[in-house]
A protein has these predicted regions:
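Beta-strand-enriched cores of mature, soluble protein domains
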Residues: 10-161
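Bacterial Sec-dependent N-terminal signal peptides
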Residues: 1-12
Length: 161
């Protein structure tokens, strides 16, 4: 019965449009020496200090503030890591923006049974409501990494339109 209701619902409602993406910025993050807290009730906890860096996009650019960290929790089988990076950025004109970036790293089999590596995250920005960057507060963002020199990570950030 549920399947027939679901099928009928699909036939009676318009399909949502596939979201588009708009490039927002590239963050070039410098990292400190990682350390391990150890096994916790939730999994193995690692912490990677965020020591600085820069960011640049069509509508903003500036620096990444030293003092944040990427808090990682590794599953018991070691295949899945949840990430929560918390840090602040400062625009070229002195506006501070808080960032909380949550994501997943997975290395294992995909739905087809093939070996897979997945690493994506969803940053949330908290810009001052009275600033010209307040538009960052009102959208969903996704990011994907690339790796370069040791001790660095680059994140490309897009706004879901």
């Amino acid at each position: 019965m549920f399947c027939s209701l679901s099928t009928n619902a699909q036939n009676n409602y318009p399909k949502a449009a596939t979201p588009e993406m708009e490039f927002v910025m590239q963050l070039n993050v410098t990292l400190g020496e990682a350390y391990t807290v150890g096994e916790t009730q939730s999994g193995k906890r690692h912490v990677i200090p965020i020591t600085g860096g820069t960011f640049e996009g069509p509508l903003l650019h500036g620096t990444i503030i030293n003092g944040g960290a990427d808090y990682q929790l590794v599953s018991a089988d070691g295949k899945r890591t949840t990430l929560e990076a918390i840090y602040s950025i400062r625009t070229h004109d002195g506006v501070y923006i808080h960032v909380r970036n949550q994501g997943i790293v997975y290395s294992g089999k995909d739905a087809s049974g093939n070996d897979s590596f997945y690493f994506k995250a969803a940053p949330k920005f908290e810009a001052p409501a009275d600033s010209k960057y307040s538009w960052l507060n009102n959208a969903i963002y996704v990011c994907a990494p690339s790796f370069g020199a040791p001790g660095t990570i680059t994140l490309d950030v897009w706004r879901v339109k």
